[in-house]
A protein has these predicted regions:
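ABC ATPase NBD coupling module
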Residues: 69-83, 106
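Conserved ABC ATPase "signature" region
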Residues: 111-128, 179
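Conserved catalytic motifs of ABC-family nucleotide-binding domains
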Residues: 153
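Helix N-cap at the start of a conserved alpha-helix in ABC-type nucleotide-binding domains
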Residues: 168-170
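Conserved ABC ATPase signature
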Residues: 132-136, 140
C-alpha cells in the first residue's frame, strides 16, 4: 500500500456570493518537494492557499494531511502542521529572536536556541537575533517571517508569493536563501507565484490555475507551457 502524500486536495471548492473562487481542485503534494501553484493575478491562487490550512472553509471537497481529513484536526494542530508565509511580513514588537520563537513561546514550550541560530544563519541573518524587528529592511523582515514559520517545524509550508513585495535585489536574495533552507531541512512546500522564472528556480512540480480551476498539472515544463 502506497504512503499517503503529505498534502492532497479532493474536489476542493469555495463559492462566495455565487462565484467559484476555487473549483474542483484535486492535487497531491509529494514529500520534500516545492509544488508550484502558477497563474495570473485573480486566478484563485491565494484563495486556494487559504483553503489549505483552513483560513477559509471549503464549500465542497476537503484537504488531507498524511491521509487524515483536516476537518478531523483541531485548528491549533492544523495551523502548526501547515505553516504560512504571507506576501508581506507582519512582525511582533520585539527582537528577531523573539519573533522567530513566537510560536513555541505562546505554547509555553522551551526554545531551542541552537536551532534558532542555525535557522537565522541559513537565512543570512547571522548576528540579527538581538535586533529589533521594527528596524529591519523589507527583505530582512521577510526572512524573519520565513524563519518564524519554519521554527514551528510544520509538515507543509505555504508560501504566498513571499518575495513579491520586495525590490529585485532583495527578492533574488530571499529566493536564493529560501531555496537553500528548503533543501537543507528537506521541507515540503506549496508556492504560489505568477512568475515563471521564480517557479523554475524554486519548484519541482505544479499546477496551472485559471479562474479557480486547474488547467494543467505535473512537471513544471508542462505547467508553464500551458500558460504560453
Amino acid at each position: 500500500m502506497s504512503e499517503a502524500p503529505p498534502l492532497a486536495t479532493e474536489h476542493l471548492t469555495r463559492v462566495v456570493d455565487g462565484e467559484a473562487l476555487v473549483e474542483d481542485v484535486s492535487i497531491e503534494v509529494r514529500a520534500e518537494e516545492v509544488f508550484v501553484v502558477f497563474g495570473p493575478s485573480g486566478s484563485g491562487k491565494t484563495s486556494l492557499l487559504r483553503l489549505l490550512n483552513r483560513l477559509d472553509e471549503p464549500t465542497r471537497g476537503t484537504v488531507y494531511l498524511d491521509g487524515t481529513d483536516y476537518r478531523d484536526l483541531d485548528p491549533r494542530t492544523l495551523r502548526r502542521r501547515v505553516g504560512w508565509v504571507p506576501q508581506a511580513p507582519t512582525l511582533i514588537e520585539g527582537t528577531v529572536a523573539e519573533n522567530v520563537a513566537w510560536g513555541p513561546t505562546l505554547r509555553g514550550e522551551p526554545v531551542d536556541t541552537e536551532r534558532l541560530h542555525d535557522l537565522l544563519d541559513r537565512l543570512g541573518l547571522s548576528g540579527f537575533a538581538d535586533r529589533e524587528g521594527n528596524r529591519l529592511s523589507g527583505g530582512e523582515a521577510q526572512r524573519v517571517a520565513i524563519a518564524r514559520t519554519l521554527f514551528n517545524d510544520p509538515d507543509v509550508v505555504l508560501l504566498d508569493e513571499p518575495a513579491s513585495s520586495l525590490d529585485a535585489a532583495a527578492a533574488d536574495r530571499v529566493e536564493s536563501l529560501l531555496a537553500d533552507v528548503m533543501e537543507a531541512y528537506a521541507l515540503t512546500a506549496v508556492l504560489v507565484t505568477h512568475d515563471a522564472n521564480r517557479a523554475r528556480r524554486l519548484g519541482h512540480r505544479g499546477a496551472r490555475l485559471q479562474h479557480g480551476r486547474v488547467t494543467a498539472t505535473g512537471d513544471l515544463d508542462t505547467v508553464l507551457r500551458a500558460s504560453d
